[in-house]
Amino acid sequence: LKFFPVILTTIFLTSNFAVAQSLNPFGIPTEESPTPAANVVAASGSRAQGWLGQGRSEVIARHGIVATSDTLAAQAGLEILQGGGNAIDAAVAAGAVLDVTSQNDTGIAGDLFALVYIAQENKLYALNSAGWAPSGWTPEFFKNDLGLESVPGSGVNAATVPGAISGYDALLSRFGTLGFQETFERAARIAEEGWGQGERRHRDLVSAERRLRNDDYSAEVFLEKDKAPDLYNILRNPDLATALRLIQKDGR
């Protein structure tokens, strides 16, 4: 892995963060449009992705802020900041929780790309922690051994060598102040104890039921009697918790 002067996860964090806010998020009233917000209708849901016609809640903080697509992940990052960790430590902690609660978006078996700005140096660093393709992935392997004309769209033979953990390790080693023991603790605990399915994640599970049923292990973790769990039900992933505990203990 190499950093290039010039992290992309689903997170943006900084220890000293300022955002210019509009005084009127719906636009400035004009003669043609005296009430620009009149047609904005509140939408239900967790707003994990944002909703048409409605912005997310504003957060103003003096000492640090954490923004993710999941409240548990944001809480994990905030705890790290409150405990004395820096923005990179918090980003890794939040990312690890997302690897548990948001596996339709991210996971420790995936890749990691990051942008890190160091204010003291006035430098922007980019990290590409994409995994390598397995050495056995040859045209002959797919055609002769698997009977395929191309790389499949799912399954073990569709995934490259995981790069996420190496990326987390590189970030912590280069820019962090903590290690896996501290930054992975909340994620491991959530995988062990379970997490509730909000509206967005429940909808994702319902839409993925058929694909999840096609894989016995995925069905065991994410489905109940071949169906998505009811809204707000608790999911647990003990095997993932074991993997996270091993990384805490042994590192990359």
Which residues does each predicted region cover?
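Bacterial N-terminal signal peptides
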Residues: 5-16
